[in-house]
């Protein structure tokens, strides 16, 4: 390795190395490599008995190689003449290429004259290798000349930063800053170009991070240096200036190392390196448990698997013992760890029983499935433990900062020091939780971003504290105030970046489940505080509820931006709007009234029931949002504890409960349906699969049309959605909990069917074709009939009886009838939509009009969906029923219309 220190520029370069570090060199070298390889491979089958002679193809290829090399020489000469750096090395490299080119030309000519000679082929291959090495070295030298140019610019910036830090007067400071800014901008452009060309992803990330720090911190160094000059007696300003200068030095080193594609001396230069350790360990463990029984050896596999599992359990135990982990969550993690241990022992026993066999037995396959399920359950509890931390820590993240700033503005240095400790602990907690979220995430790119953001937040924390201490020392100083505002803004911006990054690597389903439980806890604390007349506790807890609700709304709204607009997003956004526009204002009003009543002397009476109702509505609003978000999840994606097990156990212990029949006899009808025996569940699943086929037909039908001017399509979608909820109920899933909910849903379908009947008859009345008219009326009669059937079947009697010591669940026949009626209705709706369109076209042809012009019925093809500029990747998206806009296959209107050609026969 040669280190060139020209003008204190640390230029690391190994003259013997032919390692290609940039994409540009690869691109330039590729055509020549292809041509040389093609020439070398010409007639490569060895000696031939055919008549010897000249090879036209070889001569042509040799000429093309010669031409390509001449192009390199021409460019190389130009680079060597124009380059300010490595001039001698470049000239020598060009001459070496010219020499190797002549040798290659001679060897290729001889080979072309006698392509069957192995000796001449060998000579040409050696000449080709030497030529490629010479050209590669020339390109690498040219590349390093560019790097040297960047390092010279980097040295200018580094010197400028030092001059800015050491400026003795404000005038000198202004001059130095004005001179430095264009140099930093120039460096940023050069570094960005280099970043794009680097082959190694780690070096690209390192360059990007260093550029960001440089761009952000140069203006801050100017402000900090200015404050030092105006208030030389305030030590906090000097400390801040030195911290920022140190960060800039690290950024300069980072750019230098990344540009030369060398390893960093400091691990902190790679804040985004690595993935989720615990997630990786669990994934690796899941792979390790699958072994060929023929090669299984207990002595080899048992210690290895047990050691891996204990390492995972140690990581899980650390998470369980953390301060933010709830007691019930800690117990569940411990239980899952024990279950995983037991599952591993059972699996190893099965492997021992299968040792030496060619194929795995059913018992062994079951043990593997059980082991995988237990690790999946442990993952789920760890994810939710992380979400406990995220939900608590990333709540009202600006409060410690605002308190610190307020104390600084008042000039109270003692308070500032106290609040600085609180602020530091808060920052450390954010960083700790962010790293916890990383440990259980499989999103490698997301983890990099979180760790990079956390690293920058950690560096910013002492700077914010120093700015507050400086303001407390000079509270009247305008510069001190501006300095504080600058750091406050930087902190808030960085926290937002970290929050969004953490949200990207965590599951929205886990977030909503945990937020729902936390809000329920807080709601009950609020009620208790009200009953105990604890004003501070009431106000503080109510603030936490408002913060949690606002966070839920923000996260869910951001998530919906990733989906194409449709029924699903409309329902979710409708639930968020209800919470933000109606529920939360009412809750805030009740809290303010309660605080005012309790704070007055003497305390004024207030309506406790009103407060409890407002609090309950907050919980219900969060729950409704969560149910709306989960509507598109498949049963496999939903947690076992999503509704039943957590819901009823938790709510039965609380002081705030809804007064519906969901808790009568301890279980809802939906929960009872979930307890059906496997045989009966299989029968229902068969019916549901048949129903899903009809639903797919309806989805295909309505997706063709723009529903903005067509109430028939709108009604069809609504009926489909409600029928899906009803069939989900029969499987113990979905938002409908009891028979009363199902009956209510059936009534809604009947109302929609009645409206569709009215619209359909209007179309039929205008249709001149009697056959089409009769078909449409027949389908409308079917809708009325099946709506009536569905209404009858909706009265599902789900009961649990104890017969002979065995629990027997009734209601299967009713459930089967319900699904069958829904399937029949779905089919009738599909046929009605088709017949309505056909009848409309007949009317158009008869009257010679562009459209039917009926109110609320306009048949227009649905416009292609807009695609987002940036697609956010999500894991396990393949099973999602509603696809992302960027993934959805759009239907060709001409193709869609062609499907109606057969409809004339209806």
Curated annotation (Swiss-Prot):
Molecular function per GO: actin filament binding; beta-catenin binding; cadherin binding; structural molecule activity
Nucleus among keywords: yes
Annotated region described as Interaction with alpha-actinin, given as residue ranges: 325-394
Keyword set includes Iron: no
Chain residue ranges for the region called Involved in homodimerization: 2-228
Residues found modified as Phosphothreonine: 634, 645, 658
Region annotation Interaction with JUP and CTNNB1: where it falls in the sequence: 97-148
Region: Disordered, residue numbers: 864-894
Basic and acidic residues bias spans: 864-880
Residue intervals passing through the bilayer: none
The name this protein goes by in its record: Catenin alpha-1
Biased composition (Basic residues): 881-891
Modified residues (N-acetylthreonine): 2
Family under the similarity heading: Belongs to the vinculin/alpha-catenin family.
PROSITE patterns per the UniProt record, alphabetical: VINCULIN_1
GO biological process: one example: cell-cell adhesion
Keywords: Acetylation, Cell adhesion, Cell junction, Cell membrane, Cytoplasm, Cytoskeleton, Isopeptide bond, Membrane, Nucleus, Phosphoprotein, Ubl conjugation
InterPro entries xrefs: Alpha-catenin/vinculin-like_sf, Alpha_catenin, Vinculin/catenin, Vinculin_CS
Primary localisation category: cytoplasm
Assembly: Monomer and homodimer; the monomer preferentially binds to CTNNB1 and the homodimer to actin. Component of an cadherin:catenin adhesion complex composed of at least of CDH26, beta-catenin/CTNNB1, alpha-catenin/CTNNA1 and p120 catenin/CTNND1. Possible component of an E-cadherin/ catenin adhesion complex together with E-cadherin/CDH1 and beta-catenin/CTNNB1 or gamma-catenin/JUP; the complex is located to adherens junctions. The stable association of CTNNA1 is controversial as CTNNA1 was shown not to bind to F-actin when assembled in the complex.
Post-translational modification: Sumoylated. Phosphorylation seems to contribute to the strength of cell-cell adhesion rather than to the basic capacity for cell-cell adhesion.
Record function comment: Associates with the cytoplasmic domain of a variety of cadherins. The association of catenins to cadherins produces a complex which is linked to the actin filament network, and which seems to be of primary importance for cadherins cell-adhesion properties. Can associate with both E- and N-cadherins. Originally believed to be a stable component of E-cadherin/catenin adhesion complexes and to mediate the linkage of cadherins to the actin cytoskeleton at adherens junctions.
Record-listed Phosphoserine modification sites: 264, 268, 295, 297, 641, 652, 655, 851
Glycyl lysine isopeptide (Lys-Gly) (interchain with G-Cter in SUMO2) crosslink site(s): 57, 797
């Amino acid at each position: 390795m040669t280190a060139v220190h020209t003008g204190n520029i640390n230029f690391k370069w190994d003259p013997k190395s032919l390692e290609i570090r940039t994409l540009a060199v690869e691109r330039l070298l590729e055509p020549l490599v292809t041509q040389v390889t093609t020439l070398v491979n010409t007639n490569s089958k060895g000696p031939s008995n055919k008549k010897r002679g000249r090879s036209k193809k070889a001569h042509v290829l040799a000429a093309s190689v010669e031409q390509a090399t001449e192009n390199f020489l021409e460019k190389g000469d130009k680079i060597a003449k124009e380059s300010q750096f490595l001039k001698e090395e470049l000239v020598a490299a060009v001459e070496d290429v010219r020499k190797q080119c002549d040798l290659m030309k001679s060897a290729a000519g001889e080979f072309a004259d006698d392509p069957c000679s192995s000796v001449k082929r060998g000579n040409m291959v050696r000449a080709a290798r030497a030529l490629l090495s010479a050209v590669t070295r020339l390109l690498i030298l040219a590349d390093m000349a560019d790097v040297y140019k960047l390092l010279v610019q980097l040295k200018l910036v580094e010197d400028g930063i030092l001059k800015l830090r050491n400026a003795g007067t404000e005038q000198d400071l202004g001059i130095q800053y004005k001179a430095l800014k264009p140099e930093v901008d120039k460096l940023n452009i050069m570094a960005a170009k280099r970043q794009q060309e680097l082959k190694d992803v780690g070096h690209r990330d390192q360059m990007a991070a260093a550029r960001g720090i440089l761009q952000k911190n140069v203006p801050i160094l100017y402000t900090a240096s200015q404050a030092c000059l105006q208030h030389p007696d305030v030590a906090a300003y000097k400390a801040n200036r030195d911290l920022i200068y140190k960060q800039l030095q690290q950024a300069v080193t980072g750019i230098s190392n990344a540009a030369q594609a060398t390893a960093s001396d400091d691990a902190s230069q790679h804040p985004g390196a690595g993935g989720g350790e615990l997630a990786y360990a669990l994934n690796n463990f899941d792979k390790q448990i699958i072994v060929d029984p023929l090669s299984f050896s207990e002595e080899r596999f048992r210690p290895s698997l047990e050691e891996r599992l204990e390492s995972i359990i140690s990581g899980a135990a650390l998470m369980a013992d953390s301060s933010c982990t709830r007691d019930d969550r800690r117990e569940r993690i411990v239980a899952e760890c024990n279950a995983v241990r037991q599952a591993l022992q059972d699996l190893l026993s099965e492997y021992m029983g299968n040792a030496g066999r060619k194929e795995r037995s059913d018992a062994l396959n079951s043990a593997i499935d059980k082991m995988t399920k237990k690790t999946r359950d442990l993952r789920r509890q760890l994810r939710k433990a992380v979400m406990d931390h995220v939900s608590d820590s990333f709540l009202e993240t600006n409060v410690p900062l605002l308190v610190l700033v307020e104390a600084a503005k008042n000039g109270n240095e003692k308070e500032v020091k106290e609040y600085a400790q609180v602020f530091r602990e808060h920052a450390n907690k954010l960083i700790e939780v962010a790293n916890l979220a990383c440990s259980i995430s499989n999103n490698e790119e997301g983890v990099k971003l979180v760790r990079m953001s956390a690293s920058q937040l950690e560096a910013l924390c002492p700077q914010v504290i120093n700015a507050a201490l400086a303001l407390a020392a000079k509270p009247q100083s305008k510069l001190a105030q501006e300095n504080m505002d600058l750091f406050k803004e930087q902190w808030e911006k960085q926290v937002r970046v970290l929050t969004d990054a953490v949200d990207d690597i965590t599951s929205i389903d886990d977030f909503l489940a945990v937020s729902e439980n936390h809000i329920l806890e807080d709601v009950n604390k609020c009620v208790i505080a009200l009953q105990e007349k604890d004003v501070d506790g009431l106000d503080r807890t109510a603030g936490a509820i408002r913060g949690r609700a606002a966070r839920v709304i923000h996260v869910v709204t951001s998530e919906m931006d990733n989906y194409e607009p449709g029924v699903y997003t409309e329902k979710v956004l409708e639930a968020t709007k209800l919470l933000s526009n109606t529920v939360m204002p009412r809750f805030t009003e009740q809290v303010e009234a309660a605080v005012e009543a309790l704070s007055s002397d003497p305390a004024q009476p207030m309506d406790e029931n009103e407060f409890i109702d407002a609090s309950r509505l907050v919980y219900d609003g969060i729950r409704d949002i969560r149910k709306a978000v989960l509507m598109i999840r498949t049963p496999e994606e939903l947690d076992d504890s999503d509704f039943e097990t957590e819901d009823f156990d938790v709510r039965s212990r609380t002081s705030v409960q809804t007064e519906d029949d969901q808790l009568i006899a301890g279980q809802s009808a939906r929960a009872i349906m979930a307890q059906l025996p496997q045989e009966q569940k299989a029968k229902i699943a068969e019916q549901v699969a048949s129903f899903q086929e009809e639903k797919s037909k309806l989805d295909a039908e309505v997706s063709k049309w723009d529903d903005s001017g067509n109430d028939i399509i709108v009604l069809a979608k609504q009926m489909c959605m409600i029928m899906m909820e009803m069939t989900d109920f029969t499987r113990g899933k979905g938002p409908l909990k009891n028979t009363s909910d199902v009956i209510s849903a059936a009534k809604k379908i009947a109302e929609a069917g009645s409206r569709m009947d009215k619209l359909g008859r209007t179309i039929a009345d205008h249709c001149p074709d009697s056959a089409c008219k009769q078909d449409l009326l027949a389908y409308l009669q079917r809708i009325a009939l099946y709506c009536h059937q569905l209404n009858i079947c909706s009265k599902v009697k789900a009961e649990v009886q104890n017969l002979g010591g065995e629990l027997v669940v009734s209601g299967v026949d009713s459930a089967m009838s319900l699904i069958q009626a829904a399937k029949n209705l779905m089919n009738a709706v599909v046929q009605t939509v088709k017949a309505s369109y056909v009848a409309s076209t007949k009317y158009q042809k008869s009257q010679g009009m562009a459209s039917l012009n009926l109110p609320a019925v306009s048949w227009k093809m649905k416009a292609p969906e807009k695609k987002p500029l940036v697609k956010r990747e999500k894991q396990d998206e393949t099973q999602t029923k509603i696809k992302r806009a960027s993934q959805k296959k759009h239907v060709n209107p001409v193709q869609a219309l062609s499907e109606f050609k057969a409809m004339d026969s209806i």
